[in-house]
Amino acid sequence: MIVLGIETSCDETGVALYNTTPWGEGKPAFQGILGQGLHSQIAMHRDYGGVVPELASRDHIRRVLPLLDQSLAQSSLKLTDIDAVAFTQGPGLAGALLVGSAFAKSLAQGLNLPSIGVHHLEGHLLSPLLGQTAPQFPFIALLVSGGHTQLMKVSGIGHYELLGETLDDAAGEAFDKTAKLLGLDYPGGAAISKLAEQGRSGIFDLPKPMLHSGDLDFSFSGLKTAVLNQVKKFEEKKIAISSEIAQFHADLARSFVNAIVAVLVSKSEKALKQTGCKHLVLAGGVGANLQLRSALNEKATRNNFEVHYPPLELCTDNGVMIAFAGALRMLAKNNGSTTSGAFDIKPRWDLQSNNLV
């Protein structure tokens, strides 16, 4: 079964073709990703310091068809070779979701194909299954992105239990806001992580929110405020030496990243102990953070559990994860999982409410 995946939830337009089984008879004998195209809107939104929803929607309209053509060309397929269409139904920006939904539904209807709406987070948490060492069910998923920070127990395809989540800012959002305080470009996640590598540990005693709360929830707004207070104190000194300013920013970035990593690692380890799971999946945009990966690997070696990651190129939003998750959903429901004819989207959508019965 060849599934077309379309991702337009925020500021990346992603299109991909995934083949569930190796077949012959004129169709690809290769199982896996057949072709993909991805366009990021980062450059367009940088001047605004964040995503502008209207601009995002318009750009998705411009990009989605050329990316489909690109994916078909890569895979040497025609539209008539596609067996199903999967698209991001939510959560995300309403206008952006509507572009992908309308495109996918119209294409599916024109080709008389089934279509399936995919939960964006399900795409992320299943993407490590595409890695070299796939996790075994059940596993714990740490979903960390600009909009979400959650711990999930994953018992199988379509069977998810929320164990904990952020009570305010997501970790990725805290990265972006802190980067802005330090004068770094949008998006700040990668920039602040790179800056932190130049910093010294232990210079600032930043809080590690809810580290000892006893539950699996998160909170990062207080950490962001603590960084702001340190910036204000430094500015009051009116230091004009550029090297001192640069070192201050690097040291503060290091302390900030260390604080977030400590909380994420501690809560993940606690979730594994509470559930008895031996496999941890790290997914979402922050999943590309090398400091977090290193800390999890070190903890896994010491405490006898395994950590699984998606390929680095699949940490950001992409069409591959939507095609893959849609294919797994359809196989789990014997190809019977289709959406209604309306261009229905779910900007706010609880993953557990989408569990298979």
Swiss-Prot record:
Parts forming coiled coils: none
Domain of life: Bacteria
Cited InterPro entries: ATPase_NBD (IPR043129), Gcp-like_dom (IPR000905), KAE1/TsaD (IPR017861), Peptidase_M22_CS (IPR017860), TsaD (IPR022450)
Binding-site residues for substrate, renumbered to this chain: L143, V144, S145, G146, G147, D176, G189, N289
Positions that bind Fe cation: H120, H124, D317
One annotated GO molecular function: N(6)-L-threonylcarbamoyladenine synthase activity
Keyword terms, alphabetized: Acyltransferase, Cytoplasm, Iron, Metal-binding, Transferase, tRNA processing
Protein's UniProt name: tRNA N6-adenosine threonylcarbamoyltransferase
Lineage: Bacteria, Pseudomonadati, Pseudomonadota, Betaproteobacteria, Burkholderiales
